[in-house]
Regions:
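Short acidic, glycine/serine/threonine-rich loops at helix termini
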Residues: 1, 24-28, 68-69, 101-105, ...
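Intrinsically disordered, low-complexity segments enriched in small residues
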Residues: 1-90, 160-190
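Anaerobic metallocofactor- and corrinoid-dependent redox/one-carbon enzyme cores
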Residues: 4-6, 108-190
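Surface-exposed, flexible loop/turn segments at secondary-structure boundaries
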Residues: 21, 97, 144
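Extended C-terminal subregions enriched in glycine
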Residues: 62-63, 79-130
Length: 190
């Protein structure tokens, strides 16, 4: 749902009964029902197939909550003595959030684990070295759309943050041929 609200901080969507300070509306222009099972279906459709080269969190930038959730997932692996190899986890956040996350130790924890924390940019406009990165895993349905269809045109899969972090630490979780883009849809060639 956050992709629907991406317009320079100006809400484009109010969830009836959920959005704080939503305006009074006498009639709605449309109705969208998106339940937990719909999200589970999308995750299943967009699950990684083939080797994942890079995990990215945040689109356009991770919120403080997303970055902290990522750090919590990372911490559980670090407690087992594991590190992220080859900086396979990139966390994108705003400069403002970076300062907050730096102050509370989140940035240090992520970097100590082997993650790269980038500020004031997003996965879509970042140039990727195609000799290293040809299949991305992200927590963001919006990033998946733009990474596949935008400037980079990279095969991209989607999973919840915990699963993304698991893939960053363990590349063998998704092995096999990397998907390639056929039009705007990623396919696996065998």
């Amino acid at each position: 749902m956050t992709a629907a609200a991406a317009n320079y901080g100006c809400p484009m969507l109010w969830a009836d009964g959920l959005t704080v300070e939503a305006p009074e509306v006498s009639q709605f222009e449309g109705e969208l029902i998106f339940a937990e099972n719909d999200l589970a279906e999308r995750y299943a459709e967009l699950a990684p197939t083939g080797t994942v080269d890079l995990v990215v969190i945040g689109c356009p930038q991770a919120s403080v909550g997303e970055a902290r959730a990522t750090a919590a997932a990372v911490r559980s692996h670090m407690e087992l003595g594991q590190k992220i190899q080859d900086s396979r986890l990139w966390v994108f956040t705003s400069g403002y959030n970076y300062e907050l996350l730096e102050a509370d130790g989140t940035v240090d924890l992520l970097e100590e684990a082997g993650a790269l924390v980038l500020k004031d940019t997003c996965p879509e406009v970042t140039p990727y070295n195609r000799t290293k990165y040809n299949h991305i895993l992200t927590n963001s349905l919006k990033a998946e759309h733009y990474l596949k269809s935008g400037l980079n045109r990279l095969p991209t899969s989607v999973a919840p943050i915990q699963e993304c972090v698991n893939h960053a630490f363990n590349p063998s979780l998704s092995e096999g041929p990397r998907p390639v883009l056929d039009g705007k849809k990623a396919i696996v060639r065998v």
